[in-house]
Amino acid sequence: MMDTRTQSVIAISIISAILLFGTLYSVVYNTYLDTSNPLLTHLPHHLAKTHYFATKSNPINVYFIKKAWGWTSAAFLFSWFTSPPQIRSINRISKYLTLLMIWLLFTSWFFGPAIFERVIVASGGQCVISLPSGDPVVVPNDFCYRKITVIPETNPTLFTSTFTLPPGWGAVPRLRKGHDVSGHVFLLTLSALFLFDQLRPSFRVAQWSPLHQLAVIINIAIIGICLFSIGTTAVYFHSPLEKFTGFRKL
């Protein structure tokens, strides 16, 4: 059996190859959407009508990618609780909790705004609302940090009289224009490598219970979906640099 280092190199190489070839394809055939451009992000992907995975409403994006850490957590815990006693170690739980903290720091909170949000702002990003007309309106960054819905009635100073808005209209602002690190690539890579690492103890024991066998199958399936999702993200979303910085942050 290959040593742990070799297995890790192979896993990272597979993900790198998927990301590289997907990104090259997106550049050669102009299939990617620049998600940091406020003039484009509110529009459907230009290939949405002909490429199924170019639409953000596809089931894998809605039910898996956006909830990937939840799936990862469930798969790992199912595997850990059904593992043979000799491999059900506290060290494995510690690894999970460490990665959970990393995920939260990058995506949710880092002494205020998350690290991803800080990167966008530090690289020139602004908090932007997309009006129904497609025009972007810049608002204070705090609106994006708090993720609150902005409506003209409560924030009249943000909207000029030249904008005609439908009654009851409101929008949640997003950070745009800066370097929008691909959170999907970051999270999917984190999930795939973690689950791969956590499968290794299972393959070192000779016999599994039926429940643990099911857990292993589920973990392998989720790794497969993560790899596929990295591929679709590489082909259809984010600029090449944004995708590779999402990968390199690991």
PLM regions: where:
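Terminal transmembrane helix and immediately flanking juxtamembrane interfaces
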Residues: 1-250
